[in-house]
């Protein structure tokens, strides 16, 4: 404990946090071992531990991994509730676009260790600017198209210890031929945008990307 409190005070605080995150009978459960808890309960305990010192920001790395849909919804609802109660920010790291759409306010999309697009969640889902972001959206399974093959992004991610000289996504990008410069394979694009709230890394002019992505987005959102 960073607060250097006494053992009795620390236990009281721990029980308070366990109760806050929805652990029943916290005094009893505090004496039990991890294997006696379900996956969802273990996740709640981890959240309680992170809240012990009333942080201003909570970093949640894949908090819903390996949880069934019902428990996943409970954990996300808990995080949203705690965000308001503690007046804190949450940095949520996840590969699940459904989770992103459900809880995020702003989104940073990363590829090969770099942010390739950042913006409000609605802009990311309804008006993406980065080819990689569009590729992710196209690969999401949809009930309305359960008989169609998923559109996977071709190729493989690059090695982080041997990145391409230019844009790391260039070898997999189907739009690089539309670039106004021959820089996709030689120059890494800067994080830019016509809006200060929505930016991306791409050599293809933004207005042309909107035009090229329009048909693809119609299929994704339809």
Residue ranges of model-derived segments:
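Conserved ABC ATPase "signature" region
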Residues: 8-28, 56, 137-141
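P-loop NTP-binding/switch modules centered on Walker-like glycine-rich loops
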Residues: 54-63, 67-149
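Short catalytic/signature loops enriched in Gly
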Residues: 24-27, 120-222
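ABC-type ATPase nucleotide-binding domain
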Residues: 1-3, 110, 170, 176
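Conserved ABC ATPase signature
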Residues: 32-37, 41
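ABC-type ATPase nucleotide-binding domains, specifically the catalytic core motifs of the NBD
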Residues: 1-9, 36, 119
């Amino acid at each position: 404990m960073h607060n250097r409190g006494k053992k009795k005070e620390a236990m009281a605080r721990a029980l308070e946090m366990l109760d806050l995150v929805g652990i029943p009978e916290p005094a009893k459960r505090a004496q039990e071992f991890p294997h006696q808890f379900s996956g969802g309960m273990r996740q709640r305990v981890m959240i309680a531990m992170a809240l012990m010192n009333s942080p201003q920001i909570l970093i949640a790395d894949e908090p819903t991994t390996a949880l069934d849909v019902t428990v996943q919804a409970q954990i996300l609802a808990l995080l949203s509730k705690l965000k308001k109660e503690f007046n804190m920010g949450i940095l949520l790291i996840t590969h699940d676009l459904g989770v992103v759409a459900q809880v995020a306010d702003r989104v940073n999309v990363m590829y090969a260790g770099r942010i390739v697009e950042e913006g409000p969640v609605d802009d990311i889902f309804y008006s993406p600017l980065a080819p990689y972001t569009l590729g992710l959206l196209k690969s999401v399974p949809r009930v309305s198209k359960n008989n169609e093959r998923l559109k996977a992004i071709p190729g493989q991610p690059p090695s982080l210890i041997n990145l391409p000289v230019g844009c790391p996504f260039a070898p997999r990008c189907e739009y690089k031929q539309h670039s106004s410069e021959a820089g996709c394979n030689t120059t890494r694009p800067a994080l830019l945008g016509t809006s200060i709230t929505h930016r991306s890394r791409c050599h293809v002019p933004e207005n042309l990307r909107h035009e090229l992505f329009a048909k693809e987005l119609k299929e994704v959102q339809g």
